[in-house]
């Protein structure tokens, strides 16, 4: 699932986690962009693409019960971000 923002969008004045659905979606997309950027620095492009493909499939399956709800896109984006951040923790050293 792609981030929920246009590529050239100005950053709105939103305090995350947001007060309504559009703000919460914006915050979830922002967090996903941040974790994707961090992974781009850690993984070769081909591996990152495979990871993103896999997390999209896994998150879509995990959130399938909410498929017909308006919250579904936000849940999938949040799931993708959580998995990204779990992987990023694996790159930390023992002393971190």
Residue ranges with predicted function:
Residues 4-6:
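N-terminal signal peptide c-region/cleavage motif recognized by signal peptidases
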């Amino acid at each position: 699932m792609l981030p929920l923002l246009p590529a050239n969008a100005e950053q709105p004045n939103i305090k995350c986690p947001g007060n309504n659905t559009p703000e919460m979606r914006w915050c979830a997309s922002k967090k996903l962009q941040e974790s994707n950027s961090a992974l781009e620095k850690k993984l070769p492009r081909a591996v990152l693409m495979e990871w993103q493909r896999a997390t999209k499939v896994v998150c879509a399956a995990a959130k399938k019960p909410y498929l017909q709800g308006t919250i579904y896109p936000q849940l999938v984006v949040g799931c993708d971000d959580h998995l990204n951040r779990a992987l990023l923790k694996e790159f930390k050293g023992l002393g971190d």
